[in-house]
């Protein structure tokens, strides 16, 4: 698996754009939906993640491929907003997926630290 670069990966490009919407980067909540989400407490974007996840579940339950794609895109977008808030990047998530690649789900779960 290759590591995507900011120049050729859509997730990286979106993350770059989202970073410009952060309040400390001058993002204007009056003119940007993302800046508005990021200027509020995390509950604002966390609520959207929950809503989009529920909509994805409903689309999948109904077996509607176009809606599944659309709702997945909405969910991923709001997850990218959350990553931006916490100063994380999609590459961090992709690296974790790469680390897990080839492991059985049970093996991967057993390797996780216990809380």
From Swiss-Prot:
Xref: PANTHER family: HISTIDINE BIOSYNTHESIS BIFUNCTIONAL PROTEIN, HISTIDINE BIOSYNTHESIS BIFUNCTIONAL PROTEIN HISIE
Uppermost EC category: hydrolase
GO molecular function annotations of the record: ATP binding; phosphoribosyl-ATP diphosphatase activity
Organism: Bordetella pertussis (strain Tohama I / ATCC BAA-589 / NCTC 13251)
EC number(s) recorded for this UniProt protein: 3.6.1.31
Alphabetically ordered keywords of this record: Amino-acid biosynthesis, ATP-binding, Cytoplasm, Histidine biosynthesis, Hydrolase, Nucleotide-binding
Name this polypeptide is given: Phosphoribosyl-ATP pyrophosphatase
A Pfam family assignment: PRA-PH
Cell location: Cytoplasm
Family statement drawn from the similarity comment of this UniProt entry: Belongs to the PRA-PH family.
UniProt cross-references to InterPro entries, sorted A to Z: HisE, PRib-ATP_PPHydrolase-like
């Amino acid at each position: 698996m290759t590591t995507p670069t900011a120049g050729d990966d859509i997730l990286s490009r979106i993350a770059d754009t989202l970073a410009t919407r952060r309040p400390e980067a001058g993002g204007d909540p009056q003119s940007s939906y993302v800046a508005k989400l990021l200027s509020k407490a995390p509950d604002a974007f966390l609520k959207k993640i929950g809503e989009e996840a529920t909509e994805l579940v409903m689309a999948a339950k109904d077996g509607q491929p176009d809606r599944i794609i659309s709702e997945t895109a909405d969910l991923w977008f709001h997850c990218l907003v959350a990553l931006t808030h916490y100063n994380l990047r999609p590459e961090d998530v992709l690296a974790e997926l790469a680390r897990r690649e080839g492991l059985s789900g049970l093996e991967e779960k057993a390797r996780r630290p216990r809380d």
